[in-house]
């Protein structure tokens, strides 16, 4: 079986309201460095933690129109040329962003595996993270849809849990 390339799709369309006063609508948390040991931002770390994965290609980035120059500059700083920066005129959440990224990959003449990533996640165990991705690619190369995440420690309505009253 031919192994497909992996194109990371990095979603960085957050509004910057959850980490106020550090982040703002004009400069959401994904564009901040929250690590005292590194000047890299959450967005930059999202891509850099993937380096070394077999079949990795440069990313497709999705962001708010207002953040396009921030995104481009942050990738210039890490010497990475995105395949595309897709601008959202209005945030419509995850599913439409993923659909547009898939269409962009097709328009680039590719049939890759898309690795959908949020730009604002903190992932400490990068070695284990890469192992999980490599394992997932085995199934995805067989035509399966693969999702992964963490076991939640509590219910949070901001992540889709329904609060009964």
PLM regions: where:
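Short glycine- and Lys/Arg-enriched binding-loop motifs that mark or flank ligand-binding interfaces
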Residues: 9-12, 154-156
